[in-house]
Amino acid sequence: MGRFERHLTLWVTLCIAAGTALGHFLPAAFAALARTEVARVNLPMAVLIWLMIIPMLLKVDFGAMRQVGQHWKGIGVTLLINWAVKPFSMALLGWLFLRHAFAGWLPPGQADSYIAGLILLAAAPCTAMVFVWSNLCRGDANFTLSQVALNDAIMVVAYAPVVALLLGLSAISVPWNTLILSVGLYIIVPVIAAAALRRMLLARHGQAGLEAVLRRLGPLSLAALLLTLLLLFGFQGRQIVQQPLVIALIAVPILIQVYFNAGLAYLVNRQLGVAHCVAGPSALIGASNFFELAVATAVGLFGVHSGAALATVVGVLIEVPVMLSVVRIVNASQGWYERRR
């Protein structure tokens, strides 16, 4: 992890502060940006989100799915957590905390919007940062690559139905055409574009050329992420100044679900006798979220001023420190993990 990525929480916090201040003092400018949209797609946000997502997807080798059979137990556990546990546990936690336990501290009528953001966050398995987490816990690189490729392929067809199901169960209305448009814009098109660009770069310049391009695009992707956050918090500056406690309250269910899902994946892998070098990244992939996609979908579905967009951004704020703590737990418990029952 580079110096910039290592301090991502600091940069995110600074962008949140700057965006909130600018939105509070320059509301007219941000209102004009918010109106720059076509078919409910905010154009400045769409450009930034593509710049943010495509370089990350460029790292994914979909040919690695041929290796899935080598680690079928770890793959199975991770798929179970990512698609059958995490989205549903997040919806449940959001319902318990935001609709009930914290209802008195939240802005009236916003709980459902925050829950929608949490669902969008949990339904998208992490794509890019898991390579960093896997490396930090000495994970099997082939397992990580094949798991990420498989998750991304599943996400193309499963993200919209899972999100629609959970939003429906939470009594949150979302038009299918808007959801399909968001999936097309922010999953299908970027996946196809990244896969085609990756193939072209490998054909013309080889692996070394691809890695050189990835190094150059890395800062661009992170800069787009930070500008996206600045815009999001600028759009919501006044609301945040009036309700600073909201961010801390939204973070509570996110924190619980990260540690719950990481722990569950880790323990199930141990019960199945899976090697630690696979169980570590399995737990990390099971717990982390593709927050870039969640932000994009929240903006497309509910708008830049929505509580859903704010909830997904809280996921960005806490992602790095929380996942680093999971890495430390995985590494510190390796001796215990490898002592068979």
Give, region by region, the residue ranges found by the protein language model.
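Alpha-helical transmembrane segments of multi-pass small-molecule/ion transporters
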Residues: M1-K59, G63-A287, F291-R341
